[in-house]
């Protein structure tokens, strides 16, 4: 049976394996996603400078009614896409953070795509 520690270690290993291949630039930043038990976080990162360009999460105001379920994840995706488009960023590289592309992670990605991000 998997213990929580085993799952988090497996996720970290998956993330490091994927991060060897995924790299964000100023023109095409990395859309990094983190999912906790209570919230979901997304940020656009320029790996060359090591800076976060745009960030959004379900812990911000206005998410009390939705929370961090699939609906909340989709709203976070739309919100990060709107903020990115305001800064002139349309193309991104998706970094699922070692999480399986399913459920809340998938909804966040679909919400970002619907709002205009290209990945």
Curated annotation (Swiss-Prot):
It comes from the Bacteria. InterPro entries: Ribosomal_uL18_bac-type, Ribosomal_uL18_bac/euk. One of its GO terms (biological process) is translation. Signal peptide: none annotated. One of its GO terms (cellular component) is cytosolic large ribosomal subunit. One of its GO terms (molecular function) is structural constituent of ribosome. Keywords: Ribonucleoprotein, Ribosomal protein, RNA-binding, rRNA-binding. Belongs to the universal ribosomal protein uL18 family. Part of the 50S ribosomal subunit; part of the 5S rRNA/L5/L18/L25 subcomplex. Contacts the 5S and 23S rRNAs. This is one of the proteins that bind and probably mediate the attachment of the 5S RNA into the large ribosomal subunit, where it forms part of the central protuberance. NCBIfam families: L18_bact. This is Large ribosomal subunit protein uL18. It comes from Clostridium botulinum (strain Langeland / NCTC 10281 / Type F).
């Amino acid at each position: 049976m998997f213990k929580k520690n085993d799952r988090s270690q497996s996720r970290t290993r998956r993330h490091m394996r994927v991060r060897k291949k995924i790299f964000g630039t100023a023109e095409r930043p990395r859309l990094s996603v983190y999912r906790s038990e209570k919230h979901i976080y997304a940020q656009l990162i320029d790996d060359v400078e090591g800076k976060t360009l745009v960030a959004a999460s379900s812990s911000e105001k206005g998410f009390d009614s939705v929370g961090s379920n699939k609906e909340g994840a989709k709203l976070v995706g739309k919100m990060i896409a709107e903020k990115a488009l305001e800064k002139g960023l349309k193309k991104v590289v998706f970094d699922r953070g070692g999480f399986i592309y399913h459920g809340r992670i998938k909804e966040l990605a679909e919400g970002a795509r619907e709002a205009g991000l290209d990945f």
